């Protein structure tokens, strides 16, 4: 994971757990995914996109944009990766 404390975007590859993640575009996707979390211009919400690792098309994770907690974007991204690993149609909120 990008470790810079002032980063406005993080991107990581992760294997989705059983039940995958829920997207607005195509419903549930599963398997090896790339997750991108980007701070919105308001500085208080994050847009989350996912793709099958190695693919070109990105999908919006349901619930995105999501509020960024007090811990900041890095903390939100770490928590989100954990939820994706657990699966269960994980969402951005």
Task: Enumerate the language-model features and the residues they cover.
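Negatively charged, low-complexity tracts enriched in Asp/Glu with abundant Ser/Thr
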Residues: 1-37
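Mixed-charge, Lys/Arg-enriched low-complexity segments
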Residues: 7-8, 57-59, 65-93
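A structural signal for beta-rich interaction modules in eukaryotic proteins
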Residues: 26-46, 77, 83-85, 89
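A short, structured beta-strand/loop element
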Residues: 42-59
